[in-house]
Amino acid sequence: LLNMTSVQDLLINIVIIGIIPGIGEELLFRGVIQKEISKKLINPHVAIFITAFLFSAFHFQVAGFIPKLMIGLVLGYAYFLSGSLILPMIIHSLNNIFLTTSLFAAGGKIQTQDIQSENVPIAAVLFSLILFATLTYLILSITKPNLQQNE
């Protein structure tokens, strides 16, 4: 049970749930795993998918597997296209901060089994798909000029 009853609780959770995992997980998944898999494979897209799959599995949420896989793909492409861990760290941290702040705004209490429920609302899946497509488009729009300069 995550319980946030004050702004102080929110700020502590933003650091513990938002910022620290956003940095640490990106160092591990993109900075080590994706980088090492990319060295061994010719196709970087396969390395990004494998890393996103591992990222999603790492979170141990059956119902959240697909949304976490999609954010893992966004983070993987953000790293691949920008060539820097800073962009995926920022995206990951902002995602976590958004979720933490949303929980606080909803009353600050949520039980873990609510998150892991097998009954995922179709609206949540559609929202995840739209968010994934939007973030992918934005990342490609931002990084495409940089890629063309590097060629």
Which functions belong to the PLM regions below?
Residues 1-21, 151:
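Juxtamembrane helix-loop-helix connectors linking adjacent transmembrane helices
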Residues 52-57, 73-77:
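Alpha-helical transmembrane segments of multipass membrane proteins
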Residues 93-151:
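C-terminal membrane module of polytopic membrane proteins
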